[in-house]
UniProtKB/Swiss-Prot annotation:
This is Benzaldehyde dehydrogenase [NAD(+)] I. The keyword Protein biosynthesis does not apply. It is an enzyme of class 1 (oxidoreductase). It comes from the Bacteria. Keywords: Aromatic hydrocarbons catabolism, NAD, Oxidoreductase. Belongs to the aldehyde dehydrogenase family. It comes from Acinetobacter guillouiae (Acinetobacter genomosp. 11). Its EC number is 1.2.1.28. GO terms for biological process: catabolic process. One of its GO terms (molecular function) is benzaldehyde dehydrogenase (NAD+) activity. It catalyses: benzaldehyde + NAD(+) + H2O = benzoate + NADH + 2 H(+). Homotetramer.
Amino acid sequence: PNIQTKIIEQIWKEHIFQGTVVK
């Protein structure tokens, strides 16, 4: 049940990391 949440959190972290790196 928490698998989807973990995946979303990972994607969110990756997205933020990429955005920070790009900026």
